[in-house]
Every structure is written in structure tokens, then in C-alpha cells.
């Protein structure tokens, strides 16, 4: 008989799932979403883009290789809660420094196991991502459903200020420095900074609310707009700063949330997807050619293609639902992708987009 205390996941539409608590025995509310990656749970947990969300893993066994410091994408886990079919009791990897359960307890992350995750994922797929409450304290289903309904929705929710750096800092180049880039930290992952560093880029990471004038005063070779959590429609002041960067003709590369903010700076609209794209197996097609990339995603919003101005070209589309996955300005050195070219976790098909950014900066230097 299990010694783990009972826990309940209650969704705002009244659906409930009873299982067992296996980490911190607390209570949290957030948007319930699912991730289809088979591995990479540590990178998922520490991705700031998951702030405000309870993440369900579709793979049935999670935690077997433990946790280490090196693979974290930030200094702490950002998920509100974590849901799995079965949490591994065995930690078997030479790089492991602690078990997943111990790691989650250390950070007071509430986690649930022993539910039918297939049923939960099908429900989210059919009904959409929604508010939920996960508790090992309150076991009254009606009470938890009401708490879920009272929690803040993801629409119009601003979370970048929660995850961004409080002070600017430099991430040095791994080799001879070729370029200096300023990164707007909306929730940046370490592997993005590493990808730039490997290409000879020194990156100055600045808070999400940094003014464009302050960035331009640094005379950067380029600007990187990072991934991050929340609704891009809540970031009006940041979008206004990005507009100033666009008119300054500095090379810009946006990914994920940064891609959405760039779209809004171009005058386009963004909208909420039914259940989003989260996982390492999303097929993306290059519009101008025949190339297809298998890509890593983590987003619940997308840019509305029909609202983009004529000077912005859609470069990539999702083969599953035809969402805009990439853009470029026809005359300015500006590109973006909706997915995560740095992967972590995920395939490496899209790493070349960092090289595209390097080439934009090279060409701009020659022009100047």
C-alpha cells in the first residue's frame, strides 16, 4: 500500500483526477498543459516559459536519470506543478546529483502521479488548456474546482517581469569575440546564450523592461528577443520599445515569445492556441523551399498570419496546424522563429537559425 498522501488535480470545467503526491505536499493553481517530450524533464522544469503552468508529461515514466546542475536552463524550476503517470523510484545516471523527487521537494514543487495522463491529455487536446488546481491539502473536489475558476487565466497575463533578470549581466563568448548582442530577458534559457557564445558572441542580458534608447546606447551588433511566459498582448510597453529597435535597423533575432512580440511590433495580432505546442517533435516546413525541421516548442500563443503587413514575410509554417513558425522582414535585418532553435530538450535541426543571425550581423557590419 502506498505511503504517499492523496492529491487531486481539478480543472475549471469540473473534471478531476485523483492520484498521489510525490514531491512537496502543497497546493498550487495554474494553466494545465502537456509536453510530449520523452526526455528532458529537467530542462522543461527550469524553462522560465512555464511560469504559471502545471505541466503534464505524456511519457509514462519520468525521473529515471535524476537531476544535475549542468542541464538546468535557469537557476530554479519555474513550473507551478508537475504531473506524471509514474515517477521513477530509481535514479540511474552517472551525471545525476539528486533524484527528481528530492529536487522538486527542495524547491517546494507540488507534483502528482498515478493518474491516467492519457485521459488528461486527451481532455486538454479536446477542451483546450485551462485553469487548474493541484492539491495534496484540500481534497474537496468542489472546493478545488472553484479555486481553479478563481485563479488568473493566461489571457492578458504578464509574467515576463516575474522571470526576468533584475540587473544586466554579461554572458561571455566561448571563443574570440566577434559580436556584441543585447538580449531582452523575457525568460531566456541558458542554452540560447550558449549557442550565441559558441559563435563568438558576447551577450549582455538586460531586464525585459529595458528602454530601446538604453540598448542602442550600448551600440550592439544585434538584439536577441528571448522566449518567455505569458500573453504577448500584455506587453504593450515592451512592444513599443521593440518598434524603436526596428526603426533603428539593428539586426534582430526573436524566438518564441520574442517572435510574438516582434509580430506585434510589426502591427500583427496574436491569438491563443487551443492547447499550444509543447514538446520536441513538431514538424515545421520552410515556405520558400522543401526543407522540414523537427523542432522543439513551448508556446500557447501564435502570430496571426493574415494580420502581418506586406513587408513581413512568413518563412516557416507548422505542418500540423499551419501556424506561423517563422518570419523575416523583406528589407530590414530582422528574423524570428516561433520555436526553440536551441532545443534543450529537443532535436538540433533548427540550430542553424543562430547562424542566420550571425550572417545578418556580418552583413550589417559590412554595410555600416
Regions picked out by a protein language model, each given a short descriptive name:
Residues 87, 228, 301, 332, ...:
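Flexible loop residues that form catalytic
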Residues 221-222, 226-297, 302, 346-364:
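Cysteine-nucleophile active-site neighborhood
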Amino acid at each position: 500500500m502506498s505511503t504517499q498522501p492523496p492529491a487531486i488535480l481539478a480543472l475549471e470545467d469540473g473534471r478531476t483526477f485523483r492520484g498521489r503526491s510525490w514531491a512537496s505536499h502543497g497546493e498550487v493553481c495554474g494553466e494545465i498543459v502537456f509536453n510530449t517530450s520523452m526526455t528532458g524533464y529537467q530542462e522543461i522544469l527550469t524553462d522560465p516559459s512555464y511560469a504559471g503552468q502545471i505541466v503534464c508529461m505524456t511519457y509514462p515514466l519520468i525521473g529515471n536519470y535524476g537531476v544535475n546542475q549542468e542541464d538546468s536552463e535557469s537557476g530554479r524550476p519555474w513550473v507551478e506543478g508537475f504531473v506524471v503517470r509514474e515517477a521513477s523510484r530509481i535514479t540511474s545516471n552517472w551525471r545525476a546529483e539528486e533524484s527528481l523527487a528530492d529536487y522538486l521537494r527542495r524547491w517546494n514543487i507540488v507534483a502528482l502521479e498515478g493518474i491516467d495522463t492519457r485521459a488528461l491529455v486527451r481532455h486538454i487536446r479536446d477542451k483546450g488548456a485551462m485553469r487548474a488546481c493541484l492539491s495534496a491539502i484540500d481534497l474537496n473536489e468542489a472546493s478545488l474546482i472553484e479555486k481553479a475558476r478563481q485563479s488568473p487565466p493566461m489571457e492578458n497575463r504578464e509574467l515576463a517581469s516575474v522571470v526576468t533578470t533584475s540587473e544586466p549581466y554579461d554572458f561571455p563568448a566561448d571563443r574570440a569575440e566577434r559580436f556584441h548582442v543585447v538580449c531582452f530577458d523575457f525568460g531566456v534559457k541558458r542554452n540560447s546564450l550558449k549557442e550565441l557564445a559558441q559563435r563568438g558572441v558576447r551577450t549582455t542580458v538586460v531586464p525585459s523592461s529595458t528602454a530601446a534608447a538604453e540598448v542602442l546606447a550600448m551600440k550592439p551588433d544585434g538584439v536577441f528577443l528571448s522566449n518567455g511566459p505569458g500573453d504577448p498582448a500584455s506587453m504593450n510597453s515592451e512592444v513599443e520599445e521593440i518598434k524603436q529597435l526596428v526603426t533603428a535597423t539593428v539586426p534582430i533575432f526573436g524566438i518564441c515569445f520574442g517572435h510574438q512580440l516582434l509580430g506585434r511590433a510589426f502591427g500583427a495580432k496574436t491569438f491563443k492556441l487551443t492547447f499550444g505546442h509543447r514538446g520536441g517533435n513538431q514538424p515545421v516546413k520552410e515556405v520558400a523551399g522543401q526543407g522540414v525541421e523537427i523542432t522543439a516548442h513551448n508556446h500557447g500563443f501564435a502570430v496571426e498570419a493574415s494580420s502581418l503587413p506586406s513587408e513581413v514575410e512568413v518563412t516557416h509554417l507548422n505542418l500540423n496546424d499551419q501556424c506561423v513558425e517563422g518570419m523575416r522582414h523583406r528589407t530590414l535585418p530582422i528574423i524570428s522563429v516561433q520555436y526553440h532553435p536551441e532545443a534543450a530538450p529537443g532535436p538540433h535541426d533548427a540550430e542553424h537559425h543562430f547562424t542566420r543571425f550571425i550572417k545578418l550581423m556580418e552583413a550589417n557590419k559590412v554595410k555600416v
